Amino acid sequence: MKKHILYALLLVFVTSFSATAQKNRINGIKFSRHHFVDTVKIKIWDGAVIIPVEINGQTRHLMFDTGAEFGFWIGDEEGWMKASGDTISVTDSQNSRLKKAFLTFPPIKVGDVVIENYPMVVDKGMSDYVCDRIDGAFGYDLVARGLSFKFDTKDSVMIVTDRKNYFSKEEKGQPTLKYLRCHKTRPMVWVRFPFGLFKLVFDSGAIGGEIDLSEDFVSRIAHADPEIRQKLDAITVRKDTTVITEAGLFGNSQDSVSYRTLHCPEVGLDNLILKDVWISTDKRLSKIGSTILEHNSLIVNGNKMHLVLLPHDGKMVQHVGNENKKGLKLLLADKNDTLGVLKAVVRKDGEAYRNGLRSGDYLESINGVLITDYCTYLDLMTEAMEQHCVFRTPEGTRKEVEW
């Protein structure tokens, strides 16, 4: 079952405020050292980078999220956080919009470097989905402030520096994704598809995501150019309607959407070629997700305004082969649903359908462990290799499936 019925964590902000306010807020951040290079041991969660830090005398874990313009904290506001006086209108990944206050955090120690006056938005909307794996995230504002990072996702090490050319030797000849900062200051990079060259958000906070295209985006470009429409139709293997669920900072949503499945013989990221890529257009945002970092380390160079991928095996051609042949996704049930925690969405051409599963069936247990909450499921999906799953229909019929 593993990643093919993966939870969809979209830790993404889309924000709107004046450039002057953004500049003043970034310039208020201070670092305890200058002209430094520091190495920090990190954790990798499904391609996402998790950084241990010390805040208020405790070890916390912050994800590095290139898809977020600024930092955010998942949980309740606590006494050691201080109001900064600045507010912002924030729209999260599922289009929920709220006006939030920036809170200034006490000094944050990352390795031997202390970050002072770092502001974050605080909300507990994601608490049910991260299951204590992370406490929050650093946003892309640290790069805008002049820091560069190397995330060695093979050996789980991060190098952070304020030296402008520190990574120059490592970057030579490697896949380089140059970007322009839009007004949201998130990295937008060029990606080559069989139907053209398009710019996507590089979002390291989209946990478990490879390459996502929204149906709105695909339909728009197909409508505008008959040649692109013809190329898209040539690689479209399925059109259907499905249920999607997305978790944002301010809650979660479910919706039925039209989508298509694209089978791309190859996708290009500069001179890195991804072969046999399957893309579903049932997401709201078009982006590259964290799964790219399961096979490639990453240099984030804010001074040169580019991202550099470092393939773990040194090869510039990588086989992805991410087709979901099982045709099964699991979505969180409503909190007041007394029949179960996770419900199946089953596609008719997949293995799950042939094994008797149907949309609306509830996942009861995995390897004999009852699924009573989302975090239990998440732990089992992380640990288990072969799984014996028991589902039940809303009427109570029991179904057993081996994955």
Task: Identify the meaning behind each predicted range.
Residues M1-I26:
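Bacterial Sec-dependent N-terminal signal peptides
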Residues T20-W403:
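Pepsin/retropepsin-fold aspartyl endopeptidases
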